Amino acid sequence: MAHKKAGSSSKNGRDSNPQYLGVKRYGGEDVNAGEIIVRQRGTKFHPGRNVGRGKDDTLFALSAGSVAFGQRRGRKVVDIVPAAE
């Protein structure tokens, strides 16, 4: 009987990649158009004035200005206040 006993398997041995979520530009910081402001899952923050939302709920600046966090209708929103020229 030249058989080998079955080796035991492990229930560990896997790890997920980091997601790098969170706020990337804080209130008062200056941004250019296209810069990512918040990476999130779901709409913890909603897009406000001059802010767009990607298909993965990422918020990004549509125009240059400074970031402003606030609340509207009980929701947290992110606005871009255009720089005074």
Curated annotation (Swiss-Prot):
Query: What are the UniProt keywords, alphabetically?
Result: Ribonucleoprotein, Ribosomal protein
Location of the region described as Disordered in the Swiss-Prot/TrEMBL record? 1-25
CC annotations in GO: cytosolic large ribosomal subunit
Q: Name one GO molecular function term.
A: structural constituent of ribosome
Query: Where do Polar residues bias regions lie?
Result: 7-19
Please give the InterPro entries that the UniProt record associates with this protein. Ribosomal_bL27, Ribosomal_bL27_CS
UniProt-listed Pfam families: Ribosomal_L27 (PF01016)
Gene Ontology biological-process entries: translation
Entry annotated with the keyword Ribonucleoprotein: yes
- Keyword field contains Translocase: no
Family statement? Belongs to the bacterial ribosomal protein bL27 family.
Write down the HAMAP family for this protein, in alphabetical order: Ribosomal_bL27
The entry's protein name is Large ribosomal subunit protein bL27
